[in-house]
Amino acid sequence: MDPNTVSSFQVDCFLWHVRKRVADQELGDAPFLDRLRRDQKSLRGRGSTLGLDIETATRAGKQIVERILKEESDEALKMTMASVPASRYLTDMTLEEMSRDWSMLIPKQKVAGPLCIRMDQAIMDKNIILKANFSVIFDRLETLILLRAFTEEGAIVGEISPLPSLPGHTAEDVKNAVGVLIGGLEWNDNTVRVSETLQRFAWRSSNENGRPPLTPKQKREMAGTIRSEV
């Protein structure tokens, strides 16, 4: 087994333990707690795959971190923090487009993980573009603020938004939700394209026809769920 794989797992286990102690003292906010739960599941899976005991790995991770901290100067820590890139906020929509109220003649709604998908199934034979406002870090989508579907006339006919009760989502969550929304709109013979900005940072690529490169799994989910649920 690669020793770097083992040491990475050990450090991750110890850092999770530290974050758990922070949560136990009621110092973590909702996104912090959400990531804590997600990472716990991930560590259990990694431990099972690697055949490593989490408690033993946590102790070993503590020793690694303590050794690094002894060697770390305050100046080096400041330089490390300064070199971490900050999130960027990208906007496809204007403030008016984001805040505008809209209604649906035939409303449909689906919850996909931590995201809520809404669309008007009365819309047919329209050209539709999906626009989104979101944050980016390391040139990848970090957090979706809001996504809306617009007709050429500017009418809002669909939306994807984070659920306040389930904070925290991944780029994969967003891509899956976009796939469901596209499938629902295309079911009524609409032509849907995704903004170049969203394609670039969510899928790391773009197509001239505005369609993101959905995986076979996403295409199956679109076809299987949209008929009955959206």
Curated annotation (Swiss-Prot):
Post-translational modification: Upon interferon induction, ISGylated via host HERC5; this results in the impairment of NS1 interaction with RNA targets due to its inability to form homodimers and to interact with host EIF2AK2/PKR. There are two ISGylated forms: one form is ISGylated at Lys-20, Lys-41, Lys-217, and Lys-219, and another one at Lys-108, Lys-110, and Lys-126, they represent band I and II respectively. Lys-126 and Lys-217 are critical for host antiviral response in vivo.
A GO molecular-function descriptor: identical protein binding
GO BP annotation list: symbiont-mediated suppression of host cytoplasmic pattern recognition receptor signaling pathway via inhibition of RIG-I activity; symbiont-mediated suppression of host gene expression; symbiont-mediated suppression of host mRNA processing; symbiont-mediated suppression of host PKR/eIFalpha signaling; symbiont-mediated suppression of host type I interferon-mediated signaling pathway
Consequence when changing residue 97 to A: Complete loss of inhibition of RIGI CARD ubiquitination
Region RNA-binding and homodimerization: start-end pairs: 1-73
Motif Nuclear export signal: positions: 137-146
Subunit structure as annotated in this protein's UniProt entry: Homodimer. Interacts with host TRIM25 (via coiled coil); this interaction specifically inhibits TRIM25 multimerization and TRIM25-mediated RIGI CARD ubiquitination. Interacts with human EIF2AK2/PKR, CPSF4, IVNS1ABP and PABPN1.
Protein name per its UniProtKB record: Non-structural protein 1
UniProt source species: Influenza A virus (strain A/Puerto Rico/8/1934 H1N1)
Organism placement in taxonomy: Viruses, Riboviria, Orthornavirae, Negarnaviricota, Polyploviricotina
Gene name as annotated: NS
